[in-house]
Amino acid sequence: MVANFNPSVGSFVWVEDPDEAWIDGEVVQVNGDEIKVLCTSGKHVVTKISNAYPKDVEAPASGVDDMTRLAYLHEPGVLQNLHSRYDINEIYTYTGSILIAVNPFRRLPHLYSSHMMAQYKGASLGELSPHPFAVADAAYRQMINDGVSQSILVSGESGAGKTESTKLLMRYLAYMGGRAAAEGRSVEQKVLESNPVLEAFGNAKTVRNNNSSRFGKFVEIQFDEKGRISGAAIRTYLLERSRVCQVSDPERNYHCFYMLCAAPQEDVKKFKLEEPKKYHYLNQSKCLELDSINDAEEYHATRRAMDVVGISTEEQDAIFSVVAAILHIGNIEFAKGEEIDSSIPKDDKSLFHLKTAAELLSCDEKALEDSLCKRIMVTRDETITKTLDPEAATLSRDALAKVMYSRLFDWLVDKINSSIGQDHDSKYLIGVLDIYGFESFKTNSFEQFCINLTNEKLQQHFNQHVFKMEQEEYKKEEINWSYIEFVDNQDILDLIEKKPGGIIALLDEACMFPRSTHETFAQKLYQTFKTHKRFTKPKLARSDFTICHYAGDVTYQTELFLDKNKDYVIAEHQALLNSSSCSFVASLFPPMSDDSKQSKFSSIGTRFKQQLVSLLEILNTTEPHYIRCIKPNNLLKPGIFENENILQQLRCGGVMEAIRISCAGYPTRKHFDEFLARFGILAPEVLVKNSDDPAACKKLLDKVGLEGYQIGKTKVFLRAGQMADLDTRRTEVLGRSASIIQRKVRSYLAKKSFIVLRNSAKQIQSVCRGYLARSVYEGMRREAAALKIQRDLRRFLARKAYTELYSAAVSVQAGMRGMVARKELCFRRQTKAAIIIQTWCRGYLARLHYRKLKKAAITTQCAWRSKVARGELRKLKMAARETGALQAAKNKLEKQVEELTWRLQLEKRIRTDLEEAKKQESAKAQSSLEELQLKCKETEALLIKEREAAKKIAETAPIIKEIPVVDQELMDKITNENEKLKSMVSSLEMKIGETEKKLQETTKISQDRLNQALEAESKLVKLKTAMQRLEEKILDMEAEKKIMHQQTISTPVRTNLGHPPTAPVKNLENGHQTNLEKEFNEAEFTTPVDGKAGKSAAERQIMNVDALIDCVKDNIGFSNGKPVAAFTIYKCLLHWKCFESEKTNVFDRLIQMIGSAIENEDDNSHLAYWLTSTSALLFLLQKSLKTNGSGATQSKKPPASTSLFGRMAMSFRSSPASGNLAAAAEAAALAVVRPVEAKYPALLFKQQLAAYVEKMFGMVRDNLKRELSTLLSLCIQAPRSSKGGMLRSGRSFGKDSPAVHWQSIIDGLNSLLVTLKENHVPLVLIQKIYSQTFSYINVQLFNSLLLRKECCTFSNGEFVKSGLAELELWCCQAKEYSGPSWEELKHIRQAVGFLVIHQKYRISYDEIANDLCPVLSVQQLYRICTLYWDDSYNTRSVSQEVISSMRTLMTEESNDADSDSFLLDDDSSIPFSIDDISSSMEEKDFVGIKPAEELLENPAFVFLH
């Protein structure tokens, strides 16, 4: 596939390996046309250059999703790409428009979820990762857009996953074209549910697959002109009939036989069945059970599927009767009869099975035996009965079993088709072909011959399609392709089906001659095709022949060719079963018409060829799409990739043939930018001089001397081998460049070493010179220091001698002066102490007297109070014992609390009286103390005078003898009284202490009672609150019940939020019809009027409503940031008492007006205005409306306390200032919002307003999402520079700058924010809009990142990161309005952060999961890590240890179906409630709002002033 490959030493190549098919290595030696390769396994291989293929060393480690993008399109390159993708669970790969699916042998539910189908809906082929959904979507879109029917051909060998792929395709087509099931099951459901029935009767275990389809199936999904599924049909081809009678070990027969043997016991008895090993048709193989299949459960599942497709229970029993009869017929053995060449049932066992089979088929036992053992030959003259020998009878038995099973299978297909329902008038169809793949076994019989013929025909169709695609590619790129030749397999088809002279024609000819055998047939083939290049005779074979198919040589054994080719029903069998008393069995063998009896010879081969021609005619009228299924290993286990096996399947599936066709033209196709980025180093001057990419590519190729290439409009087309030649030259340039770089680096390192050495020498010299200079300087410093020390020491000694002398003199003087001062101080202290002692003694005596009096009074008072308190305590205890439960007697408890409060107040008054008495006594004691002090002062004055007089007298008078005191008795009396008073005071002090203790105890008891009373009061408040809440709930439930009752009994048309009604106003009044005279409250018209006056009043009211609607239906602006329309509507409804009216049509007209106003869903400004108006009106209704007396504004407050203590506590808690402010605010709010009694129409109006708020919120949010959706697809992938690298000077992006798309997103966010702010949308709604929008951005960017491999690159991560930085800046600037929106981008932020981090291979899994990307799941991390490739620095992704850890974790979580999903879901729910809107506004915000000026001029709206 690669011509002119000239490897050099150092080139990397692929060489053949007996174990791995192909192995890579490095060329270490070139000898002429031979090279020596060092393989990655470590061994050396010598091979010819023609047997080696170049390896692309720059291919991504995770492979490419489209193999046409491979640098080298050859076998080892394709195999390596599939292997790389299979290792990371990327089981789907494109080859152009062909999808290759490698069976993972494990469940991957995340790849097939409904969310994944939504991702592929409308995406062009190749835009997202390869997937069957992409193929199905491309077929569906092409059918709708081009008006051409489509077909999807699914092929592969047994076990490759064809059936599962077909199911996925049908699921997606049902998703795209399915209609809502109004009655019963839809067409697509019936098609999908018919699979279990067909699998039960058409699938079996083979060597390579446990559930292999042994028939071909073509499902036609029919569509109408609108693209909806209108019908379907299933066509089957070549059921393997011989499997019914012949089963090779270790295969199994069809599943239905084993299911029936494992059926419930009553069914087993009814059909007289035993274990499978007892039946000849089943025990030819030792494999009777499968580990992965429970036959009993499958039996019930098949029964249920039959019910779904419309097969009745009677028909099901008849079907399984035929299946059981086949098993019994297989157990009939024959022995030689009495006559020559005759046969009879061998033994009683055979007779039993014969009888049972006759009973199950409802036919005569003897007639069944005769049909098996005899033949009737009709001649002109007579009828001859011929007996059959045992061998012939056995063949007759097997022929009957095969024809019965074949007819049964055909009946099932017809029944399914009739149940599904075909649309013969359908406009288009999409056909899904599930056909067997190319087969080559050790023994190949007639079935393999037909299967391989089918694959040859389909391969020719496939080759023509690939050729056509190549032509379209060349035409699209406008290159010359007329001289290109492609390989065709028409010669093989002529060999097989040419008439006359083909193999099938010769086989039919042999079947028409009774004496022909397989040996004569083989000899005929040898003679006819001995010179044919595709036909050979194997050595030592007498009846085998070999055909050289496109996928390889297959040797066929002709032993059973003639028997298997005969397509006729033995007349005896036909007559027997047609006469069956069972209508079902008789319908399988209808009587043959005279034309069919006299028709020409018919064979399986001819009939199959006709079916094949019919199929190809259908395919030729459709646009084909191809899916090639690959089985990675024969063990049917996950994680095993067998190169040789897969390579053979690629050849059999035609993939390699398609590659050969591509290689016949231009196998290598590179976009200009990729080509220049890779090979620009071959001619850098060309890139600098040329700004035109095609011209630069042409000059580069001309410079390197390549010929035969083509320059298209967007790509460079290279012939086979030219890419390898360019890579060889590139390797040489890189080698020379590496040598130059090494030389420069070594020169740089030598210079650097010299400079370092020179600098080191300079530093050493500098250090030495510095050391010498510092030594000299140190000596000079020491000499100067010695002189300073000597000078300072002498000065110190002189100063010390002087200081000692001076201190001695001062000490002597200080001692003398201190002694004199101390004597004077001692005298003064003694005098002052005497005065203080006298003062304290006198004061103590006075205080002692006062305390005695005070203690005596307090003791008396406390004794009395404690007596009274103990009495009260006894009463309270008695009352407490007699008091019942708190809830049952709350009125008594309140009374007791009031009494207790009164007692506490009484104690407080007593305590106050005591304090007043204390104050009076203290005042008296103070006054007496003052009198005593005054007397003391007078006495002191007299004493002083007496002392002075005595001194004077003593100085003047002579010495007199002392005279004794005469009044000694008086002194003794005073002393005794003093002692009595002291004893009395001490006793009073003791009593006072006891009284204080009792007082403390009494106070503690009183405090405990007070606490108990407070707790009781709080419990009462809580109970009342709970009771009030229950009452409110009961009232709300009664109101809802009333609303529901009125809704059920109401008969007129209800209003629709999306499309309001247009019926006349008079007949539409919230579900009721009434006279206009009764619409409004009678209080509105207080003056008695007659009928005419009442009618005029009603008309005036209608005119007022019209005036209101005409005014508010347009944008009338805002007042103080609040919508004037909402306030005006609310005031009018409040004044007209509409909220309290049982029947009114005002609300219906307002709803109709709002619905009409928001019909334009694209005008965000208009929607924002009405969003603000309706939310404000909803807030006013929420605050105003109440049901059955429970006001909305009071529902959240606890009930007011009715007890005396409760009222006292509330008065203590609230201050006068706060009460005045609250009263003022409440009064202002009540001036705007007034609680009213709401009736049913008002409550319904409130619900409709809430629905409109949610609808308008969703419309504004969805408008922003739609605006951003187109920009997000441009923001996920960085634009590629046309010539990449650093070979060309940078140029400005202009209008295509990467920042333009992100700036457009910012502009869109700003534009909407300005609109919302201008219309005063509540802040909570703005934050929710942006929060959900950022969540949508996160979902779209993250899912696109995980679905597109080209987005998981380093440069793309930097591009998206810069855009996210712009969004973060916007969030910071609009923080008040964006709220937590930035946090919604956590998934894409962490994913992009991982893409741009360096040295990923050094990061452990714990660091990734815990530090870098804690939000991402292991499936998401695994997806990013495996898809990542560094397009800037060519660095590696994470290590294999990290990948292995992720795989282990995913395997552990594989039991959870949702755990495998790596995509995010967009949340379109309404993220707020009415309470959120209410919490964002306050009643006082509406104070001072001016009503609509237009209405103020209307006399009917005077109340608005």
Swiss-Prot record:
Residues 8-57 form the Myosin N-terminal SH3-like domain. It comes from the Eukaryota. Expressed in flowers, leaves, roots and stems. PANTHER family: MYOSIN, MYOSIN-6. Belongs to the TRAFAC class myosin-kinesin ATPase superfamily. Myosin family. Plant myosin class XI subfamily. Head-neck domain associates with cytoplasmic (transvacuolar) F-actin in areas coinciding with the tracks of fast organelles. This is Myosin-6. It comes from Arabidopsis thaliana (Mouse-ear cress). The gene is XI-2.
